């Protein structure tokens, strides 16, 4: 059985037949009931028959150490894929990524579908958070989930024609007819946005009173972005609500099919635009698995250092805007002063501020500049005192506590059902942080703690955990400063680094290869890889499929904010509108992370 913390190369292609869950599945369903796919994802990948899907899912959910979280669910257009040796015939496929917290292990189930029969039973009967994932898969691929409670578009407008992630759907604006907004089209779009309660199983009233339906957003300041929630109200009490997303959708996964492996890096920064280099980490690690690259120790520590700087930067904005949502304004200005110091440090190292696009496949863009250690030392001396002032001045305030303690509270069972990760999950008492549970980029070499709550995740607990996470990030940065390894800032690998000049003078073919890789992009081996990380807002992951080309065949981006917004109705029903504002502030999301 593979130890997830073992120091074997992360890029090995494995079928994971030694994983206990494979034996458990074979004992229950027979040795020939499914096909095991060898990949570089680091998890067992099992192709099962459509008719077995719900039975297998239920079996995994009821094991002694169960697979309790549906981490991700999406699809792939397999029609143009050439490297499918040993896999079931498929025009399309749907994958289900499940996590067992007790085992600290995952499994990925795949179902093959024919183009003339794109139907699969809904997974919502087992995992309620499958709802949005199935809607997105239908929206972007046209795969129907039989029995889904309300299968309708979620990313694209309701009037949209076609399914954008299909391979025969255009990927460039120049392939479309020029856009025209006529009065008739404008009226049609406005009508499509009109909320009809009956479509969502809501009643307009009872025998004695009518409910009010209120649009919060998509331009409300407390919605934290282009985000609409339709509220069903009885007075100020929220009877039910419907989150409406997609206004910020930019087709990030489709772009991954039209960019080279290197040129997609700047797009990762903008998936969650506050995270900076944190967003680059899972992508470059996943590509390095495909390429078979092991990076130098110096690269690992530099990446951790930049990631923790951006984690602090994001948490400061989150904490201060949460306080602002509750009613206090001053901490926002204090936080922006502190964030400016981080941006100055990031700019000195990378040359950029919010979106450095600085990590590279195999390393980083360039080495650390002279004086980086002095700037980091100054910040580490400055920040702890400021953090203490935030707690004393605002977070211990009795009014803030009264507005946030016990609000939008849920337990571990609810968190797992809705795919909640990050501070929201840890507040329920579940100690699961990817940096500790499944260390990447050398996190296993750092001494830090994971703050965990007492069993109930409410608004106040989520914020206070982030404050403690800030302190732990400062501990990590202190270790980066004191223990920065010597060595190269990039791996010596032909898929990512130009060959040394002395080699090119002796072997011209190395220069030819370099020319092709710079002009067209490196050709990655045909395989699949996966990498999850502990991002600023929860678990972020990239699932990449290479067909032996200069571009990704399929880029799946799983973000924490998408799952967290789906949970809103379950957590806020029966509360007041004012509680919803506090709850939204406690989630920590940006709409670019939700909509991609």
Curated annotation (Swiss-Prot):
One Pfam assignment? Complex1_30kDa
Which catalysed reactions does the entry list for this protein?
A: a quinone + NADH + 5 H(+)(in) = a quinol + NAD(+) + 4 H(+)(out)
Which InterPro entries does this chain map to?
A: NADH_DH_suC, NADH_DH_suCD, NADH_Q_OxRdtase_suD, NADH_quin_OxRdtase_su_C/D-like, NADH_UbQ_OxRdtase_30kDa_su, NADH_UbQ_OxRdtase_49kDa_CS, NADH_UbQ_OxRdtase_CS, NDH1_su_D/H
Q: Where is this region: NADH dehydrogenase I subunit D?
A: 210-596
Annotated GO molecular function terms are: NAD binding; NADH dehydrogenase (ubiquinone) activity; NADH:ubiquinone reductase (non-electrogenic) activity; quinone binding
Which cellular compartments is it found in? Cytoplasm; Cell inner membrane
Q: How does it sit in the membrane?
A: Peripheral membrane protein
**Alphabetized UniProt keyword annotations:** Cell inner membrane, Cell membrane, Cytoplasm, Membrane, Multifunctional enzyme, NAD, Quinone, Translocase, Transport, Ubiquinone
- Taxonomically, which superkingdom? Bacteria
EC no. given is 7.1.1.-
**Is Cell wall biogenesis/degradation included in the keywords of this UniProt record?**
no
Matching PROSITE patterns, A to Z? COMPLEX1_30K, COMPLEX1_49K
Q: Which GO terms describe its cellular component?
A: cytoplasm; membrane; NADH dehydrogenase complex; plasma membrane; respiratory chain complex I
Q: Name one GO biological process term.
A: respiratory electron transport chain
Q: Where is this region: NADH dehydrogenase I subunit C?
A: 2-186
Question: Cross-referenced PANTHER family, in alphabetical order?
Answer: NADH-QUINONE OXIDOREDUCTASE SUBUNIT C_D (PTHR11993:SF45), NADH-UBIQUINONE OXIDOREDUCTASE 49 KDA SUBUNIT (PTHR11993)
Family to which this protein belongs: In the N-terminal section; belongs to the complex I 30 kDa subunit family.
Cite the record's note on assembly: NDH-1 is composed of 13 different subunits. Subunits NuoB, CD, E, F, and G constitute the peripheral sector of the complex.
- Protein's job: NDH-1 shuttles electrons from NADH, via FMN and iron-sulfur (Fe-S) centers, to quinones in the respiratory chain. The immediate electron acceptor for the enzyme in this species is believed to be ubiquinone. Couples the redox reaction to proton translocation (for every two electrons transferred, four hydrogen ions are translocated across the cytoplasmic membrane), and thus conserves the redox energy in a proton gradient.
HAMAP family per UniProt? NDH1_NuoC (MF_01357), NDH1_NuoCD_1 (MF_01359), NDH1_NuoD (MF_01358)
The entry's protein name is: NADH-quinone oxidoreductase subunit C/D
What organism is listed for this UniProt entry? Escherichia coli (strain K12)
Instruction: Tell me the organism's taxonomic lineage.
Output: Bacteria, Pseudomonadati, Pseudomonadota, Gammaproteobacteria, Enterobacterales
